From Swiss-Prot:
GO terms for biological process: maturation of SSU-rRNA from tricistronic rRNA transcript (SSU-rRNA, 5.8S rRNA, LSU-rRNA); translation. Belongs to the eukaryotic ribosomal protein eS8 family. It comes from Pyrobaculum aerophilum (strain ATCC 51768 / DSM 7523 / JCM 9630 / CIP 104966 / NBRC 100827 / IM2). The lineage of its organism: Archaea, Thermoproteota, Thermoprotei, Thermoproteales, Thermoproteaceae. GO terms for molecular function: structural constituent of ribosome. The gene is rps8e. HAMAP family: Ribosomal_eS8 (MF_00029). This is Small ribosomal subunit protein eS8.
Length: 131
């Protein structure tokens, strides 16, 4: 029996011992969007517009100062300044680092609010007043 028939390193070499080459070059769609950039509490609202699959555009929020807060009792929404991030159930470290994600509890001018939108995907912070 030949050793080549039982060679296990299939991802690097061929049974003949030759080196395997790439089938195609790396396509842009396979690269992904890079490391996650989570929106932070900042001095002003900063957004970036990114081209995504299908030629569509996605608005991403980088820094946030204001949130659209819905007040259930009054049935209206107001633009409120964000004072601080109280807690983030997704990751406790996010609150310490001032990252704003869906599910975060934020302190605003009108009171505590729960973030209902995905700021990194939608480009806006929508929240519902909880106190």
């Amino acid at each position: 029996m030949k050793l080549g028939a039982y060679y296990k390193g299939g991802d690097l070499k061929k049974p003949s011992g030759g080196k395997k080459r790439k089938v195609r070059k790396t396509k842009k769609k396979a690269l992904g969007g890079g490391p996650p950039q989570i929106p932070k509490l900042g001095e002003n609202d900063t957004r970036i517009v990114e081209r995504v699959r299908g030629g569509n555009l996605k608005v991403r929020l980088r820094e946030a100062k204001f949130a659209n807060v819905y007040i259930p009792k009054e049935r209206k929404s107001v633009k409120a300044k964000i004072i601080s991030i109280i807690s983030t159930p997704a990751n406790p470290d996010f609150a310490r680092r001032n990252f704003i994600v869906k599910g975060s509890v934020i302190q605003t001018e009108v009171g505590k609010a729960l973030v209902t939108s995905r700021p990194g995907q939608d480009g806006v912070i929508n929240a519902v007043l909880i106190e």
